[in-house]
Regions:
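Cysteine-centric segments in proteins
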Residues: 1-107
Length: 107
C-alpha cells in the first residue's frame, strides 16, 4: 500500500491485514470488495459526533484510491475456424497499488 501523509500532525491509527484496512479499531474495509472496472475513490471522515463515516463528513481523516481492475487474456480453446479464443481473466487484487492518504487529526 502506498501511504501519503497529506499534512503535518497526528494521523489516525491503521492496520492492514491482507486486503483489509482497519482504521482506529473502529472501521474495517475489505478493499478488494471495492475494486471495479474504473478507479474508485473513498473518503473517510469524522462526522459531527466524532464517529468515522465513509463519505463526506465534518473533517477528513483518510482517502483511499483503488485503481481499476486489470485483466489478462488467456487462450481458451479455438473457434470453429481454428482460430484461438481468448478469455478475459481478472488479475488478483494488489494492495501494493492502493493509495491511502492520511490527513491530520488536528484542526
Amino acid at each position: 500500500m502506498i501511504v501519503i501523509e497529506k499534512n503535518i500532525g497526528p494521523k489516525i491509527d491503521y492496520t492492514v491485514e491482507e486486503t483489509k484496512l482497519t482504521l482506529n479499531d473502529e472501521m474495517m474495509l475489505d478493499l478488494s470488495k471495492y475494486e471495479r472496472e474504473f478507479d474508485v475513490h473513498i473518503d473517510i471522515c469524522y462526522n459531527q459526533f466524532g464517529m468515522l463515516v465513509m463519505g463526506l463528513g465534518e473533517r477528513y481523516v483518510a482517502q483511499i484510491d483503488i485503481p481499476a481492475r486489470e485483466y489478462t487474456y488467456e487462450q481458451n480453446g479455438t473457434d470453429e475456424e481454428g482460430n484461438p479464443k481468448y478469455e478475459k481473466v481478472p488479475v488478483p487484487f494488489d494492495m501494493d497499488k492502493v493509495t491511502l492518504t492520511l490527513w491530520s487529526l488536528e484542526g
